[in-house]
């Protein structure tokens, strides 16, 4: 503390003479009382690693780590439970031709015709055309699992994996470049006494004061105004929120284009479920369960200071396998499957409706000539009358004149049935008959080749929890990475004495206290608590890349990707079983004429009559009996590609694709809640010297001090002017009132980062990750319950024709009856060649999503995976976003307890001349000098330069272990431009002032009296001890 006494108004006896030369240095004084606690020393060297602590409780979820390397594909899952009954199937295909119809009712009585002889059987007709493809057979048993498909395209990046285990210690990095100049070191121990300094300037004369009585203690000063610290930095990003609820079902999509006509054939009846297979091997780990329910929000922590970004933590232990998820929702309809093998022919359908009459066949060939009639008698030549019915053939008369053409005769009765004509052309296909009864299931077909990959299904909802696996406990995993800092524990016992801390910068001045009586020298105080954690060092160089972390948990399903390109066409399947009979072939060419009948007896030759006009075309004869069945025709050409079938059910999931490359670093998470306030930072550097305060009032006279020891005799001085000898100077008076506060000092460095705040509330759900690759196909599940019956199929082909009815009595000629039922089916043609694969059908409409399954319970924590191999160095991350606005200055902290008295250090180098001391006691009268006029008091001289650095002291005891430095990490630290302060004339360097927003000046706040006390109270602000460095 410095007091300033104004002597300008003093008057009285003559002044003492000028000050004599400085005496020799006195012996050291007794030890002083314990000083106030020093400021926190710099952090000591890191200690040896401690023994491993007990495993901590599981910390809150850390931020998402970087993407781990791709893991191996998982093993196939266990067979799923039997699925629920599927939706009603699509309309079935047309049924097979119906069975031969019953014989029709007897026809109307026909006109009696003379029975003709049966003609010779016609030549075998041409081979029929290939029939249409048969209906699909019943579903065969599931084939064996096909070979794994080719690796899928690289999937999107999975979500960040759990942090990997700590990597092996990297090799020592190269020496770094020289760092920036460090902050000022701690004050050295006192040096050895230096050489005597030059004599100080003459002191101004002291006033003659009679020793005053001891003053009474003053009243306690007012409390200081609160300080303004900066607000803490923003807290860390909260952990991702739980998975949101399923959204409402989307609106129905637009109606798709109508598909082409499906392939025929109804599906067979569902077979009975087979016996249960043997229990399969234990399945691989199931997909992760959904996030647990959201925990209650924690209390809001106080804001902490923002630390440097930490490095990625070591890998956590591998979690326990989750229980099996619930069945997913019904996936979207898959692409059309390949046509199944043709089923066995179904039972005959019921009799079809009578078809329309066929077109008349061509006229049959002329039959052989009949036997000649007997000769008639010759008639007289008639006049040319109307042409009568021909009489019996007479003997030939003379040729009469040509008669006129007779009118056409009435229609004669039907002739005898001619020989079977060549088959007529195919009639039109009759209306489809009703569906036949489903045939029995065909035998299991051979396994077809793997089809092309289906489209990716929509993500299913979260499955229900599976049963807990029965595996034995795994070995103990490696030690997990340290959790975040816990809440402050109870205060521990005082630690052992730390090394002496360096002298801290002065704190802000408190209000003046009462002046205490001088105490005896105190005993050496106990060792103070260890100083607070030092500031974070600059980020170290990037360490070697850590070992690869264990495989991350699969991310949530991604959004549905675009439709992939069709896979390559699979290998042709084996030839299907023989198809159903083909349609009737086209009419073959007429067969050659039959053999001639035996010749009749020769008649007598009649006269050749004139050619009559052609008669009208006769009615078609009744159908002849069926000819013998022709041989099977050759195999017809492949039929045209069938129409697009109904969309098949979802195929089994494809094999797991290789994991995609690591995704880019995600955007920064949202700001976390503010952490708790950090500890009080170290006191800032000395402020600039304040303006000179106004002169305080003179203190009361102090009590008389004890007489000093006599100094050695000086040389006799010349006699001085006679002065009234004054008494010994009194002790220093009380300090005058303080001057007004000086200008605000420069901003100190930021305080150490506070302990981590409690975890923030869970952040909002992150965006849905891209869909991961599908897992490998599990073994087939049990057969599903039979679906509802399909819609009725279209009518089958016409049945075979019924047997001929018995001949009825000859009736009047009826109107043409409807054509009889078609004849019996011919022998089946040879199977047609396999047709080319049809084009993929258009994608069906998306089915509605099934209801979400219930959330499964959380799985047991699995054993930790082994540490991965040492990974390559990661790429530098992008610079983070600029920090938030500068906070307000925090409140001034309480003063710390007094520190222990440090041991005495070695002597330092001689310091510069100190400020002027109080006037010494009068020396012996000097020799007479010339009486000079006292000059005016000169201005204070400039501050002297620092003395040379003293020799380094012995090293102190090792300090307590410092806090762990910030981990090396893969981000580039971009510092703000450093603002430079003017050079300090008393240090040979520059201070560097770092301020977040580039400002050099801090806001000054007005202090009004009412901020400190009532209007009628005096107040002052005391400036504490000043340390000139």
Swiss-Prot record:
Record-given protein name: Collagen, type I, alpha 1b
Keywords from the UniProt entry: Collagen, Extracellular matrix, Secreted
Region Disordered, residue ranges: 1-990
Taxonomic source organism: Epinephelus aeneus
Family: Belongs to the fibrillar collagen family.
Pro residues compositional bias, start-end: 13-33, 952-967
Name of one Pfam family that matches: COLFI
Gene3D superfamilies: 2.60.120.1000
Domain (Fibrillar collagen NC1) ranges: 999-1029
Record's GO cellular component terms: collagen trimer; extracellular region
InterPro entries referenced in this protein's UniProt entry, alphabetically: Collagen (IPR008160), Collagen_Structural_Proteins (IPR050938), Fib_collagen_C (IPR000885)
Any one GO molecular-function label of the UniProt entry: extracellular matrix structural constituent
């Amino acid at each position: 503390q410095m007091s300033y006494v104004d002597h300008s108004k003093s008057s009285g006896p003559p002044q003492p003479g000028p000050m004599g030369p400085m005496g020799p240095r006195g012996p050291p004084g007794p030890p002083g009382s314990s000083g106030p606690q020093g400021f926190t020393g710099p952090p000591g060297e890191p200690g040896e690693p401690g023994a491993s602590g007990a495993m901590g409780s599981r910390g809150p979820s850390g931020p998402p780590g970087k993407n781990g390397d791709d893991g191996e594909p998982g093993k196939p899952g266990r067979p799923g439970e039997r699925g629920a009954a599927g939706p009603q199937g699509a309309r079935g295909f047309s049924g097979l031709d119906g069975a031969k119809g019953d014989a029709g009712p007897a026809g109307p009585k026909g006109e009696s015709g003379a029975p003709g002889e049966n003609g010779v059987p016609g030549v075998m007709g041409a081979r029929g055309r290939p029939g249409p493809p048969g209906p699909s057979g019943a579903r065969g048993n599931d084939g064996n699992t096909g070979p794994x498909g080719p690796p899928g395209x690289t999937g999107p990046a999975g979500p960040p994996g759990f942090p990997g285990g700590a990597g092996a210690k990297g090799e020592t990095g190269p020496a770094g470049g020289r760092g920036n100049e460090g902050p000022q070191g701690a004050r050295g121990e006192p040096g050895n006494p230096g050489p005597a300094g030059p004599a100080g300037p003459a002191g101004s004369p002291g006033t003659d004061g009679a020793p005053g009585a001891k003053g009474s203690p003053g009243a306690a000063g007012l409390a200081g105004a609160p300080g303004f610290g900066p607000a803490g930095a923003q807290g860390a990003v909260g952990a991702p929120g739980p998975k949101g609820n399923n959204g409402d079902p989307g609106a129905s999509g637009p109606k798709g284009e109508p598909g082409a006509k499906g392939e025929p054939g109804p599906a067979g009846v569902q077979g009975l479920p087979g016996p249960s297979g043997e229990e399969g091997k234990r399945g691989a780990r199931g997909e992760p369960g959904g996030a647990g329910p959201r925990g209650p929000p924690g209390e809001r922590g106080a804001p902490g200071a923002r630390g440097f970004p930490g490095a990625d933590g070591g890998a956590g232990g591998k979690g326990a396998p989750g229980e099996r998820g619930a069945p997913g929702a019904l996936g979207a309809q898959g692409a059309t499957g390949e046509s199944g093998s043709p089923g066995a022919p179904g039972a005959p359908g019921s009799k079809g409706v009578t078809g329309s009459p066929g077109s008349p066949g061509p006229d049959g060939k002329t039959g052989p000539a009949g036997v000649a009639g007997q000769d008639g008698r010759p008639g007289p030549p008639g006049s040319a009358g109307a042409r009568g019915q021909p009489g019996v053939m007479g003997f030939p008369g003379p040729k009469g004149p040509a008669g006129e053409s007779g009118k056409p005769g009435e229609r004669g009765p039907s002739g005898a049935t001619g020989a079977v004509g060549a088959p007529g052309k195919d009639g039109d296909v009759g209306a489809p008959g009703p569906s036949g009864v489903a045939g029995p299931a065909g035998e299991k077909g051979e396994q077809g080749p793997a089809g092309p990959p289906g489209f990716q299904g929509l993500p299913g909802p979260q499955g229900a929890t599976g049963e807990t696996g029965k595996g034995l406990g795994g070995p103990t995993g490696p030690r997990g990475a340290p959790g975040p800092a816990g809440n402050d524990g109870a205060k521990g016992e005082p630690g052992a004495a730390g090394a002496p801390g360096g002298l801290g910068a002065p704190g802000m001045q408190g209000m003046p206290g009462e002046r205490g009586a001088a105490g005896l020298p105190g005993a050496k105080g106990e060792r103070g608590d260890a100083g607070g954690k030092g500031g974070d060092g600059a980020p170290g160089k990037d360490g070697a890349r850590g070992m690869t972390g264990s495989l991350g948990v699969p991310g949530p399903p991604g959004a549905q990707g675009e439709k992939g390109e069709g896979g390559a066409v699979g290998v042709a399947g084996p030839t299907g079983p023989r198809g159903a009979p083909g349609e009737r072939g086209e009419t073959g060419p007429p067969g050659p004429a039959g053999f001639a009948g035996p010749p009749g007896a020769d008649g007598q030759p009649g006269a050749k009559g004139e050619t009559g006009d052609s008669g009208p075309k006769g009615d078609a004869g009744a159908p002849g009996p069926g000819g013998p069945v022709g041989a099977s025709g050759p195999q017809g050409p492949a039929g045209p590609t069938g129409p697009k079938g109904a969309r098949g059910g979802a195929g089994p999931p494809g094999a797991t694709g290789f994991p995609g490359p690591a995704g880019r670093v995600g955007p920064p998470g949202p700001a976390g809640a503010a952490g708790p306030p950090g500890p009080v930072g170290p006191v800032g550097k000395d402020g600039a010297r304040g303006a000179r305060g106004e002169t305080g009032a003179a203190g009361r006279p102090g009590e008389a001090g004890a007489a000093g020891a006599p100094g050695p005799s000086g040389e006799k001085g010349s006699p001085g002017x006679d002065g009234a000898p004054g008494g010994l100077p009194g002790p220093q008076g009380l300090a005058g009132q303080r001057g007004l506060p000086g200008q605000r000092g420069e901003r100190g460095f930021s305080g150490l980062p506070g302990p981590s705040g409690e975890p923030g509330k869970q952040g909002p759900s992150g965006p849905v990750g891209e869909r991961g690759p599908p897992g490998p196909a599990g073994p087939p599940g049990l057969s599903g319950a039979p679906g509802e019956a399909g819609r009725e199929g279209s009518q089958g082909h016409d049945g075979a024709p019924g047997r001929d009815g018995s001949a009825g009595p000859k009736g009047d000629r009826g109107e043409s009856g409807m054509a009889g039922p078609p004849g019996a089916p011919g022998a089946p043609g040879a199977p047609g060649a396999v047709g080319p694969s049809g084009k993929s059908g258009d994608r069906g409409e998306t089915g509605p999503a099934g209801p979400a399954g219930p959330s499964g319970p959380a799985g047991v924590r699995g054993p930790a995976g082994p540490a991965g191999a040492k990974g390559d160095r990661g790429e530098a991350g992008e610079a983070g976003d600029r920090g938030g606005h500068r906070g307000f200055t925090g409140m001034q902290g309480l003063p710390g307890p007094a520190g222990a008295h440090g041991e005495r250090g070695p002597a330092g180098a001689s310091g510069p001349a100190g400020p002027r001391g109080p006037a010494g006691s009068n020396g012996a009268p000097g020799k007479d000098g010339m009486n000079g006029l006292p000059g005016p008091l000169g201005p204070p001289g400039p501050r002297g330069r620092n003395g040379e650095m003293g020799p380094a002291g012995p090293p102190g005891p090792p300090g307590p272990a410092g806090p762990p430095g910030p981990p090396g990490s893969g981000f580039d630290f971009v510092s703000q431009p450093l603002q430079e302060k003017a050079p300090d004339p008393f240090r040979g360097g520059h201070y560097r002032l770092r301020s977040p927003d580039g400002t050099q000046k801090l806001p000054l706040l007005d202090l009004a009296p009412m901020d400190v006390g009532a209007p009628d109270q005096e107040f002052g602000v005391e400036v504490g001890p000043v340390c000139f460095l």
